[in-house]
Each structure stands twice: as structure tokens, then as C-alpha cells.
Amino acid sequence: MMSEIWKCKGFANAHTHLDKGMLVPEVVYVDAPASIRGGWTREKKAEFTKMDIYDRAEKALLQMIRYGTTYVRTHVDVDPVVGLKGIEAMLELQQAFAKQIVIDITAFNQEGFDRYPETEKLLQEALTMGRMGLGGHTLVDVDGKLHIRKMMAMAEQFDVPWLEFHTDESGKPEDFLLPFLAEQALEQECGDKIYAIHCNSLATVPDIKAAKTIELMANAKLHVTVCPTAVATRPITRTKELLKAGIPVGLGSDNMGDLFNPLGGGNMLGYAQLLAYVQRFYEPEEQLALLDMIRRGPADLLSASSHHELNVSVVFETQEARELLSHVPLPQIVQDKVCSA
């Protein structure tokens, strides 16, 4: 019954920021409001080189692989501060690690159009450099709805394979743009390409409003990505309710060793364990649902094909979901035999 658990194709990290990761311990973490740490991050980004980004991201990837991750989707900042250095580095890593892990890249509008209008042209240039998705953030511009519209228009113009939004990340009920995003996706019939990351405010709006929004999301065919480390500063979204509605939910590490989270080793079982504790995924079926979340490979067909072609399997000695989530054991990474025709 559980054979797929002890031997699988590997784990999926649905959301991270490899370009800004592994700054700690060289940079000493200091706790401060998010806006202050965002400013510090911009200062560091101005110092980034392509090789610096490559080296730090490589370190994170090697850790992920050690823990059994064979698929990762990473946001990469694109703005006048860092330019296209992160995209260039990640495209090189994508090729260098092609036989070990599938890396999907999302060109990310972290800073917004208001702060840096030049970002629009840089994002457009990034989208011509290789096959990648596009990423926005519902809270970085004064008019979040306009931000969503502009990002969706760019995604359509360049026919991107996926579009992601850091969605309502503050967790405040007044920052609730998820229904608008779902409405736009439904209207444009593109929800199967759209990923709503975090969705923290869904946890703080009234239950009736949340239920209506989840129904709208399901009708729009949106995907959701949950990052449990966000619990340090805000409520986690309604994961169980989203799963019950049949919405595809993936799990992401989010930040790793940066100025927003100095911890994070890329062990997806560890992140699943954290979510299990925080939201009480304790019943046997719920534990299996958690493992399904971290085994959810890429929905994009080309990425899924690349993932399928990896000659790698992740093997655990136990067949019990409870044991995996309780002890977070290290896997054995094995090379699958390739049968010649």
C-alpha cells in the first residue's frame, strides 16, 4: 500500500529564492521588521555578481539533492538593482544540474513597478533568455489589482508556461486580493497556469468569505503553494480546506539562509513535518496528503517530461508515513537502471 512512499521519484520544492539564499552566515542575521530586512536585501543585491549567485545557489541545490529533492521552482529577482545576473546564473545551473534535479525558473518582480518602472523591460528581456515563468507580488505596488493585471498581460504577451503571485503575504484581511486574482483567472481561462503562493490573508478573513473564495479558486483551477516557515510572522493559509476543495497544493521551503530566514536546509520532509505540527496533519490520510504535496512534480508538461527522464530514485527504509514525518530520515539516493532498446 505504501510502496510509493519508500521509493519515489524524489521530492518537489515548489517555491524558493535560490538567488538570495545562503547569505548567512557570511552576513549576520539581525531581526527587524520585514520592510527593514527588505531594504537590507536590496543593499546586498546591489553587490551580487553572477558568480556569487551561482555559488550560493549551487550550495543550496546540493543540500536539496542530499535530502531527496529532484524538482525545484525558484523565483529569481529581476530589477534595476540586480539586473539579469540571477537569471543568467540560474540558466547555467539549470544545465549543470540537469541530470540530478529539474530547476524551473520564475522571473520575479520582487520590488514592484512603482519603485522601479524599469523592471517591466527587464522582465520582458528575461523572458526572451530561456523558458521560464513570471512572478508577481500583490502587495509591492500601491494598486495591487493593477499589478495583477499588468503581470497577467505580460504573461499572455510572452505566452509564459506559468504565472505565480506572492499573494496577500501580510496576512491582513484588508490585503485580500486572492478573490480578484481568481476572478481574473476565471475570466481569462488561464487559472491552470496560475499559482497563488502563501495566501496568508485567506486564514484571517471570515469563514464564509474564505469558503466562497476557495470555491472560486477551485472553479478557476488555480494552484496554491504553501510555505510553512511563514508561520514565524503570519498565519498559514487554510491548507486542509484547499485540499478538500480539490485545489492542487504544493509545498515550498521559501527562503533559505537569507535576511528573511537564516535557517532552512532544503529538506522537504522537514517542511512537511513543520506543517503537520502547525496545522495538525495527524490523521493517517492527512499524513499521506502531506507526502503527496512534497511529491507533487511539475504540472508543466515539458518540466514533467524532464523530471520523468531523471534516472534517480529516493529510497527510505521505512514504509510508514508517520515514521517519515516523525523522524525526517535521510534518504538513499539511487541511480535507476536505464534499459537500452
Question: What is the predicted role of each segment?
Answer:
Residues 184-194, 240-319, 338:
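His/Asp/Glu-enriched, well-ordered alpha-helical/loop segment
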Residues 39-55, 106-117, 137-141:
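Active-site mouth loops of central-metabolism enzymes
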